[in-house]
């Protein structure tokens, strides 16, 4: 998982005149469709012809534009536009009869382009950050896939565009006043265009985000011309903070379906479309804080890889912080008791509730989870790897801001991986520890919607122990049967067992072997098989048994085997060969970052040239150690197509000055 890059850590030298030549082009060739319902909404899109290069398979990228006031039908004041970016890929096989899957990354504030480009999308970006190769395990093999950047201001989605200055040393970002001259850029001072970075013009919590996404879906599924299925089933797959997104969004959609069907929804004509929900898949999701917090001390100290990431004393301190009077557990219970009375819909409308819930999250994170980060030296998303880890490779970060990619997508701003303003808006209302997520999952199951929980067993961030506890914490009609189901091996092919699964009917919990936070990146075939089996009503264990109808005796299909899977042990993996990609400083050591700042680093295509990178990517960085040429102000250039080119585009990645459009 790529973290938000600290700007000072990303300090690079920029030649201002070169950077200005690389600004994203004004979008051209964009199709504009005004809503037929007169709501003021519209769709803009292009056929980019990128990433999915399989002959005959179409893709479309664009925006659903929602005007101010769209959310008023939910009693929410919204005085800003919501321009939500999407990228849709037809299924490679029989798209007319294929179901549709929606993919969203978490954060909150993370772009779904991360999942698309490194996990389950049609292509991967090569080490040159300028070309792609097809992914044979893409989730659009048999499913139409829709990737969405949400909530507004995430990734390529925006409210309004504005010009900013950015000081790379102090990390200060200042909005330029209208008519103010564009300042001259230098090595540590840049200008550019972003979404507004106004915390008041993004979603304040998961429930608020669900409302905006539902309106997006109403427009897209009724009016987007590139989607004409005979199969109207819609599934949602999400990851990480998607442990909240998935339950809340899907439950909200189903609640709206019920209101439309029974006539209690009084929205305008364009908001009467029933979304035929089929499956919710959560990949390494942080679902319920109260249930999952005990899993962090266990994962750090007693996991199936026999890795003691913290010592006994630190482990005891983590447990004490969790269970002592006034500790993490008590703070969350206090948050939930207040929110259930004063803010039952988790809209952030009560400042006392917000503060109490925010305080609970801060305490629990610092004292229960973060000792692992402070003392282990291991990766947050893969306990088997030491920090820094270069996996999944961040080559896509530069590719998404290549001028030809921006032009093909028709986007009016630069892409960013994570938005700290969005994350802050969620944290400000204490969205993390609030209640309701497991209840949402129970509601979905009671309404016939499948729930598939998938967890890589090397992740710490939202680890599988917590995922298992969440699965057992869902209280619904078949809870007893699910608890009594044993674990069965996940048969991927004739020679490979990909993990263990407990399943009864529409609910499954899968532990995937040898996988970190982003399961499809680590185990692409296993992830694809689980995805297909979930959507096509097959058992997760073998893919051969029907799960949609009752068997003899009136029971649904259920797995049998051991009551838990802890007894299935793993060996720690070898370490990845390390390389530093300067657009993602989480892949770099402190010394490497300093070498970029002080001008001693040699860099090609955003990769620091050393013995590791020359062995991994000789066609990109060269096969031997180069002789760097100093550049004024710091970094070094290898050639006109080496570091200098990288610096020019990084200016575009961080910021850009463009004509404000759409």
UniProtKB/Swiss-Prot annotation:
Listed A to Z, the keywords are: Carboxypeptidase, Cell membrane, Disulfide bond, Glycoprotein, GPI-anchor, Hydrolase, Lipoprotein, Membrane, Protease, Signal, Virulence
Q: Family per UniProt?
A: Belongs to the peptidase S10 family.
Q: Which residues form the active site?
A: 240, 459, 517
Query: Carbohydrate attachment sites?
Result: 130, 163, 186, 200, 262, 302, 311, 350, 414, 475, 493, 506, 598, 612
Q: Point out the signal peptide segment.
A: 1-21
Q: Which reaction does it catalyse?
A: Preferential release of a C-terminal arginine or lysine residue
Please tell me whether the keyword Disulfide bond is annotated for this protein.
yes
Its annotated compartments are: Cell membrane
Q: List the disulfide bonds.
A: 51-123, 328-364, 335-357
Quick one: where is this thing mainly located? membrane
User: What is known about its induction?
Assistant: Expression is strongly increased during growth on protein-rich medium.
Q: What is its EC number?
A: 3.4.16.6
Taken from the record, one Pfam family name reads Peptidase_S10
Coiled coil (residue ranges)? none
List the GO molecular function terms: serine-type carboxypeptidase activity
Question: Where along this sequence does the record place binding of substrate?
Answer: 462, 518
What is stated about pH in the biophysicochemical properties? Optimum pH is 8.0.
Which superkingdom, per the lineage? Eukaryota
Lipid attachment locations (GPI-anchor amidated glycine): 633
Annotated propeptide span(s): 634-662
The UniProt function text for this chain reads: Extracellular serine carboxypeptidase that contributes to pathogenicity.
Membrane-spanning intervals of the chain? none
Membrane topology per the entry is: Lipid-anchor; GPI-anchor
State what protein this is by name.
Carboxypeptidase S1 homolog B
A single GO BP: proteolysis
Which GO terms of the cellular component aspect does the record hold? fungal-type vacuole; plasma membrane; side of membrane
């Amino acid at each position: 998982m790529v973290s938000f890059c600290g700007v000072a850590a990303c300090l690079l030298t920029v030649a201002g005149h070169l950077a200005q030549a690389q600004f994203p082009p004004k979008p051209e060739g964009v199709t504009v469709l005004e809503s037929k319902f007169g709501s003021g909404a519209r769709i803009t899109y292009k056929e980019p012809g990128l990433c999915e290069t399989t002959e005959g398979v179409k893709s479309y990228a664009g925006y659903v534009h929602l005007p101010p006031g769209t959310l008023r039908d939910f009693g929410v004041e919204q005085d800003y536009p919501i321009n939500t970016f999407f990228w849709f890929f037809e299924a490679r096989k029989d798209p007319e009869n294929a179901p549709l899957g929606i993919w969203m990354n978490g954060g909150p504030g993370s772009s779904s382009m991360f999942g698309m480009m490194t996990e389950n999308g049609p292509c991967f970006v090569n080490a040159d950050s300028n070309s792609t190769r097809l992914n044979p395990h893409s989730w659009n093999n048999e499913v139409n896939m829709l990737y969405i950047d949400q909530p507004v201001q995430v990734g390529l989605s925006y409210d309004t565009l504005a010009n900013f200055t950015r000081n790379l040393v102090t990390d200060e970002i200042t909005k330029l006043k209208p008519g103010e001259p564009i300042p001259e850029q230098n090595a540590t001072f840049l200008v550019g265009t972003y979404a507004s970075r106004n915390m008041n013009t993004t979603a304040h919590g998961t429930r608020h985000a669900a409302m905006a996404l539902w309106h997006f879906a109403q427009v897209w599924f009724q009016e987007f011309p590139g989607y004409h299925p005979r199969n109207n089933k819609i599934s949602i797959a999400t990851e990480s903070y998607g442990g909240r997104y998935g339950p809340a969004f899907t439950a909200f959609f189903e609640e709206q379906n019920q209101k439309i069907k029974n006539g209690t929804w009084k929205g305008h004509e364009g908001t009467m479309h029933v979304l035929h929900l089929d499956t919710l898949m959560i990949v390494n999701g942080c679902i319920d804080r109260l249930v999952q917090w005990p899993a962090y001390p266990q994962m750090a100290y007693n996991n199936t890889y026999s890795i003691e990431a913290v010592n006994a004393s630190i482990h005891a301190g983590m447990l004490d912080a969790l269970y002592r009077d006034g500790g993490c557990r008590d703070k969350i219970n206090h948050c939930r008791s207040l929110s259930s009375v004063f803010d039952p819909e988790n809209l952030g409308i009560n400042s006392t509730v917000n503060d109490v819930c925010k305080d609970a999250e801060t305490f629990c994170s610092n004292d229960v989870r973060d000792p692992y980060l402070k003392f282990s030296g291991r990766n947050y998303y893969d306990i088997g790897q030491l920090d820094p880890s270069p996996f999944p490779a961040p080559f896509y970060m530069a590719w998404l801001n290549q001028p030809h990619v921006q032009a093909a997508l028709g986007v009016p701003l630069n892409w960013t991986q994570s938005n700290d303003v969005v994350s802050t808006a969620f944290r400000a209302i204490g969205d993390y520890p609030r209640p309701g997520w497991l209840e949402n999952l129970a509601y979905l199951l009671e309404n016939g919607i499948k729930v598939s929980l998938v967890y890589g067993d090397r992740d710490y961030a939202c680890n599988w122990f917590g995922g298992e506890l969440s699965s057992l914490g869902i209280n619904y009609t078949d809870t007893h049967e699910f608890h009594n189901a044993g674990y069965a091996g996940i048969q991927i092919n004739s020679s490979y067992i990909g993990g263990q699964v407990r399943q009864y009917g529409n609910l499954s919990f899968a532990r995937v072997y040898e996988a970190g936070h982003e399961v499809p990146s680590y185990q692409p075939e296993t992830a694809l098989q689980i995805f297909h089996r979930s959507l096509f009503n097959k058992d997760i264990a073998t893919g051969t048994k029907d799960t949609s109808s009752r068997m003899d005796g009136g029971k649904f299909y259920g797995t049998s085997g051991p009551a838990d899977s802890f007894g299935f042990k793993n060996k720690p993996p070898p370490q990845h060969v390390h390389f530093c990609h300067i657009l993602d400083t989480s892949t770099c050591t402190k010394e490497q970052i300093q070498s970029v700042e002080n001008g001693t680093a040699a860099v090609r295509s955003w990769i620091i040239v050393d013995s590791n990178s020359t062995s991994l990517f000789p066609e990109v960085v060269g096969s031997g150690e180069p002789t760097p040429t100093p550049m004024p102000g710091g970094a070094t250039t290898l050639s006109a197509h080496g570091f200098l080119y990288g610096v020019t585009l990084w200016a575009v990645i961080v910021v850009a000055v463009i004509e404000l459009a759409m």
